[in-house]
């Protein structure tokens, strides 16, 4: 069965310069190779990475740039050697579309840490082409980087799992944050933070949301089911949390202090950093004297991604989303910068290009 875009034009929206303004764009996807899967994109989540690269914040953007790495859709064609997928399957594609497949990390299903991994957009693939992401009608990927979405799990809800979901799930599993009865602190309540709360509750943890904004209290407790809420600037509230948490997931964007949060951990506690502040300053005593750890993490490997999707389907865990059409994307990206979304924008791709 031929793919909708095939070797012809693929409709998309792209940024042409560091203004980050996106507009309609056409380009050619590669032909399906023997180990490739081609999918019609139905939905694509909107991540802050889309802002960073469309606006050249990291000074490495390659224009025209088609963003989007939270992709969900339906298989339209498979290569001759593909055994894991068939036409009609619901699938997802995440933050990377290639890796060396031969290093220690790849052989351990940690492809996200492969030194040669290729980003889903604004990356350079092995054939020298610049990758283009999910703000488009169609994508072709090697089957290793494609993931099954169980029938019945809404594709619009599945899309954010491919970045926001796995970015939280992977460090939680690596640090055994799935022990019922333990306590979890979640710093920040955006796209990643709200997924950390959902996973924490599903794991049977006592979840405390820590935010700079009192306005997040109702969302945290009434909407997401957190057990506790603390405003980080309130010294009295923070004092009551000292040495009470087994784990902390830090999703806060931008620069922020670390010592006040590390003191909230029990002896042997772990704080996982998921964001990219410009620097990290920590007093050694807050680590050494409590046997505490500060750990970094970025997305997740292929094994974890499929496991996470299956876990969400089995436990009816769904991201909270605001659905938009592609022609609203410039407003949505600015709203994301302004932190005006609850909790993830998802583009209705299949109804945006008709």
UniProtKB/Swiss-Prot annotation:
InterPro entries: ADH-like_C, ADH-like_N, ADH_Zn_CS, CAD-like, GroES-like_sf, NAD(P)-bd_dom_sf, PKS_ER. Zn(2+) 1 binds at residues 47, 69-70, 163. SMART domains: PKS_ER (SM00829). Zn(2+) 2 binds at residues 100, 103, 106, 114. Keywords: Lignin biosynthesis, Metal-binding, NADP, Oxidoreductase, Zinc. NADP(+) binds at residues 167, 188-193, 211-216, 251, 297-299. Pfam families: ADH_N, ADH_zinc_N. It comes from the Eukaryota. Binds 2 Zn(2+) ions per subunit. It catalyses: (E)-cinnamyl alcohol + NADP(+) = (E)-cinnamaldehyde + NADPH + H(+); (E)-coniferol + NADP(+) = (E)-coniferaldehyde + NADPH + H(+); (E)-sinapyl alcohol + NADP(+) = (E)-sinapaldehyde + NADPH + H(+); (E)-4-coumaroyl alcohol + NADP(+) = (E)-4-coumaraldehyde + NADPH + H(+). One of its GO terms (biological process) is lignin biosynthetic process. Its EC number is 1.1.1.195. Belongs to the zinc-containing alcohol dehydrogenase family. This is Probable cinnamyl alcohol dehydrogenase 1. It comes from Oryza sativa subsp. japonica (Rice). The lineage of its organism: Eukaryota, Viridiplantae, Streptophyta, Embryophyta, Tracheophyta. The gene is CAD1.
């Amino acid at each position: 069965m031929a793919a909708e875009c095939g070797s012809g034009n693929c409709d998309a929206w792209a940024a042409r310069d560091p203004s980050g303004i996106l507009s309609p764009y056409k380009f050619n996807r590669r032909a399906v190779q023997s180990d490739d899967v081609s999918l019609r994109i139905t939905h694509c989540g909107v991540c802050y990475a889309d802002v960073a690269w469309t606006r050249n914040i990291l000074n490495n953007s390659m224009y025209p740039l088609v963003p989007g790495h939270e992709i969900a859709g339906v298989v339209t064609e498979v290569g001759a050697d593909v055994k894991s997928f068939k036409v009609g399957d619901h699938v997802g594609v995440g933050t990377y579309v290639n890796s060396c497949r031969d290093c220690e990390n790849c052989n351990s299903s940690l492809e996200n840490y492969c030194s040669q991994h290729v980003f889903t957009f604004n990356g350079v693939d092995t054939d020298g082409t610049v990758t283009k992401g999910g703000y488009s009608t169609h994508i072709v990927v090697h089957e290793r980087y494609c993931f099954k979405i169980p029938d019945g799990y809404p594709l619009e809800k599945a899309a954010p799992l491919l970045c926001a979901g796995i970015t939280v799930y992977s460090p939680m599993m690596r640090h055994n944050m799935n022990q019922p009865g333990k306590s979890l602190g979640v710093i920040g309540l955006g796209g990643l933070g709200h997924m950390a709360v959902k996973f924490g509750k599903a794991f049977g943890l006592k979840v405390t949301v820590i935010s700079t904004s009192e306005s997040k209290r109702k969302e945290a407790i009434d909407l997401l089911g957190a057990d506790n809420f603390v405003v980080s600037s309130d010294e009295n509230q923070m004092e009551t949390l000292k040495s009470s948490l087994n784990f902390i997931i830090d999703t806060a964007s931008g620069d922020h202090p670390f010592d006040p949060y590390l003191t909230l951990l029990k002896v042997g506690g772990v704080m996982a950093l998921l964001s990219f502040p410009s620097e990290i300053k920590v007093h050694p005593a807050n680590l050494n004297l409590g046997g505490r750890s500060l750990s970094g993490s970025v997305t997740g490997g292929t094994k974890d991604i499929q496991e996470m999707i299956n876990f969400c389907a089995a436990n009816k865990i769904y991201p909270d989303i605001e659905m938009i059409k592609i022609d609203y994307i410039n407003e949505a990206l600015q709203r994301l910068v302004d932190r005006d979304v609850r909790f993830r924008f998802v583009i209705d791709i299949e109804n945006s290009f008709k």
